[in-house]
Structure formats: C-alpha cells, structure tokens
Amino acid sequence: MRKYLIIILLAVGLAGASAQRAMNRPYVDDKLVHFGFSLGMNFMSYSVVESLEPVSGRLDGGTFSNQILHARVSSLFPGFSVGFIADLRLARYLNLRFTPELHFGERTITYVSESGDLGKFSTDILCMPITFPLMLKWSADRESNYRPYVIGGGGVSYDFGQDKEKMVLQKPLDYFIQVGFGCDFYFSWFKLCPELKYQLGFNNALTPINERSEGISADADGFYTNAIKHLRSHMITLTFNFE
C-alpha cells in the first residue's frame, strides 16, 4: 500500500506545481451545473462481529465438529473505480453533487480456530458494487489555481458481484455514509481533483446460511457463514475527478 501512496503523492505534487501559474478558467466555478467523470482505486474491508458459537463442517477433505472460529479481514487489495459526476452550485462555497460510481474489488476473510487444531484458512469475496451517493461539497476560497474542499453525504449501493458458489455471500443492497476531502487544481481546459473518501455501510451485509437455497452445502460449508454474526462494509476510495 505504501507504493500506491508514494505514486499518489507524486501525482498530486506535479498537479500542484503545474497549477502555480496564471489563473486558469477563473469563472468555471460560477456555472450553475457542470458534469465530469472520475477514475481511481479503492480498498474494501469489513468490520466483523464473530458469533463465537461452536460450528462443524468439512475442511481439506476431513471433518471437524464443535469448533469456535475467529474471523477477520486479513488483507487489503487495491481495486478499480470509475464514476460520473453531476454538480449543482448552491452557493459560493457550497455545491450539491450526485456521483454514481462502479467499483471492482475483493475482500478476504481469514479464519482461525480457538483451539488451534485447524490452522488458518480463508475465503475470498469478489465485490462489484455500484454506489449512488448524494454529497454536499464545501470549498475554501480559491488560491491561484487550487481550491481545497471537504465533502460528505450518504447514499445506497447495490452489489452486482454476487457469486452464490462462494462460502460467504454478501447481501446486495446497502446504505452508507461517506466523508472525504480533496483539492481542485485548475488547468486550461479542465479541473483535476484528487479526492479521498471513506465509506461506512449501515446494514449487516452477511447473508445467513438459512437464506441461501443454492451454491454450497449448508452442512459441510456453512461454518464459514455461521462463524460470523455481523459484517459491516467499509471502503476507502482515491479518485481523480475530471470536471
């Protein structure tokens, strides 16, 4: 992850250096409505509440019974995000934004038994949510060719990446809040806006094993799900907005 942060800081630094010239597009922020698009990366995770109830099942060709499993998200993998921007100017410093985005990512949940008999094992969850956030953007005064801002709001998401063959199945619908910050850099033909956001889901994203009618054997593989009581989604996105 450090490598990605270094690349990001270099890109932002170059953008800032380019912006320290004559004022570009001095009246662009006076437009009532404008549009754009975004490209970037994401890091998806869960907060996991364990059930701490004994589970049984089949693992690596053998069976086990009455084991208490601990689960956590073991790694963060970078994903890809692309989106559309619609911006409505409400006041000099305040804008209303609708920014639907499609995200491609992956989460890995790692399990370990309390007794230590089973060792570590994991399952991957491929995610492809489309988010529909409605955000308020508050901007500071413009300085030369840059203008920092903060942003916040909420919305709804729907995950199209469900794979019923996976050991853990995420519910497709979720509601979330989102906060972040960024900076507008003004160039001759467009604004480039690096933006960092954090998203927190409200719903329990876990599909209980008794609600799954196909895909896995509840008796043999249900322990992946039964070891968990609650999943709440988290996502960090870094996007470069072109407006």
Residue ranges, per PLM feature:
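Bacterial Sec-dependent N-terminal signal peptides
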Residues: 1-24, 240-243
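Short glycine/proline- and aromatic-enriched beta-strand/turn motifs that initiate or cap beta-hairpins
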Residues: 19-78, 235, 241-243
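Predominantly the C-terminal beta-signal and adjacent terminal strand-loop region
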Residues: 24, 172, 185-243
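Gram-negative (and chloroplast) outer-membrane scaffold detector with strong preference
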Residues: 26-33, 41-43, 85-162, 237-239, ...
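Residues that define the transmembrane beta-barrel architecture of outer-membrane proteins
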Residues: 31-33, 76-80, 126-130, 146, ...
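Flexible, solvent-exposed loop segments that connect beta-strands
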Residues: 49-73, 105-125, 160-170, 206-228
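Short conserved catalytic/interaction loops centered on acidic-Pro-aromatic/His motifs
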Residues: 146-147, 164, 168, 190-193
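Conserved C-terminal beta-signal and adjacent last beta-strands/turns
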Residues: 157, 178-186, 191
